[in-house]
Amino acid sequence: MVTSRYYIFDLFGTLITGSGAEIMYAEALNGLFPGLKHWNVNQYINTKDLGSAEMCISKALEYFNITATSEQLKKFEEIINSWKKEVHMYDEVEEVITGLKKRGAKLGMITNDSNIIAGFIEKFGLEKYFDVIISSYKVGMAKPDPRIYELCVEKLGAQMSEVIMIGDKLDRDVEPPNKLGMRGILYDPEQKNAYYPDRISNLKELLD
């Protein structure tokens, strides 16, 4: 049974589709700027508020001393916008989060995102359900930095031992919270990590 007064959720790949954002970044950046280490760019844009999508990638490339043409920036934005159209909220999400709220639970969210892919929380109306929402680019740090989990727990008014975090990535949503004293639960709908003991394949299991 999964019960708590406090829950923290990941966003992409847990509440909404789009866990492939970093793969999409990599393909887009490697295609347009061969040799660029996309992971460094991800880390940079995920921890800074840089404005529009085009401005965001432009500043990131400038930071890494790479000159981009207007055509390259336009193409990158087209790739991002095409990807955005495919993102949707998982069917069971509203039932689960409303069910938890009815039980008196306080809900938090921690998401590694940037100006480039911001806006999905508002698009799907998720903000009304969550007591605390932490976006990496707004606070200048990203998962798995321990401080971002500590910030969310503090804002929830909870103790580490009282909190359950649910997400689809072991290295960001499960193992770091466990080390801090929370309970990290892996959301694994495709059962890719069947060996992992503390996991769920459907968010509705949180209501069991």
Per-region residue spans from a language model:
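Asp-based, Mg2+/Mn2+-dependent phosphohydrolase catalytic module
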Residues: 1-7, 17, 69-71, 94, ...
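N-terminal helical cap/lid subdomain that shapes the substrate entry/recognition surface
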Residues: 2-95, 99-103
